[in-house]
Amino acid sequence: MTAIHIKFPSLTLKAGPRALARIREHGLNAADVGTLPGAAGGPKALGIQGLDLALFGEWLPAAPRERSLIGASVGSWRFASACLPDAAEGIRRLGHLYTEQNFAKGVTMAQISQSSQRMLNDLLDGRDAAILSNANYRLNIMVVKSHGLLADDHRGRLGLGLSSVIADNLRGRARLSRHFERLIIHDPRLAPPVNALNDFPSRFVALNAGNLRQALLASGSIPMVMEGVRDLPGAGTGTFRDGGLLDYHLDLPYSGNDIVLYPHFTDRVIPGWFDKTLPWRRACPTRLQDVLLLAPSKEYLARLPYGKLPDRNDFKRFMGDAPSRQKYWRTTMDESRRLGDEFLELAANGRLGERLLTL
């Protein structure tokens, strides 16, 4: 990437206490990064494409090592793209395919699921084995198994189930155990990058050629938007849905002593999807000690068209005018190069530590 003159800070950089002390003393080295989380967030991923390109196209390959990539929903799709033989091409292709999607008014859950399956097939293009055998990256896909009414795609029953989830979540996040089981479908060459998971029923499932596509599809299957994935190979019978329902921003007990580098859409870590409107529901500080979070700054966002990153509501906002939405999304992807360029410059000149805020 060629450097862009930075007139205002494009990035907000926040770090947990151990990461902050380490970076301020020794700087940030790619060799120190062992884990990268990827949050759920739909089209917001397009808004940080330039950051992904800088990380996976330039910075991380300069210090090759075994790294865990753990994502929910679009986070898992971003990381699957980065595991393709040409990471930069894969990341750009995901942005192109996502942008080209278009839905008419009244589109059904089945139609959106079918469109997503086609997009996934076009993205992987028969290169599943390359993802599973990537020399440096170990992919972890977050999925939930749904219980009770949430296992049904009938809109009425599913709606009742979601109402029950919302009510239980208000009473306490732990009550979501009644509704969901967490699954991490992971590259069997390396255990998932987390310590013991005691907050919800959780299990690990080996990722392989027989379940890669179903796992990716399930990880992004938002209830009431897409159908759930049935009987995921290796995970047993049942209905499997978006991993972001439980782990929206991956507030997880990360293992090891490496830096957890988190390219994110926002400077907040929100535990679950149902916590988005609950400002008091915050991430656990002890889980963030080794995290370095990179996110678009408020100044950067204010200069984007519509003053924000792309989001799922854009499909409704631009209903009947797909070219305008696509132009907006492409502009946002182009602008996001500033995020990547600023990160590369800060990492290279050793001044990243000066910009760090406490996470």
Per-segment meaning from a language model:
Residues M1-S68, S81-L359:
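Patatin-like phospholipase
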Residues S73:
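Catalytic nucleophile serine of serine hydrolases
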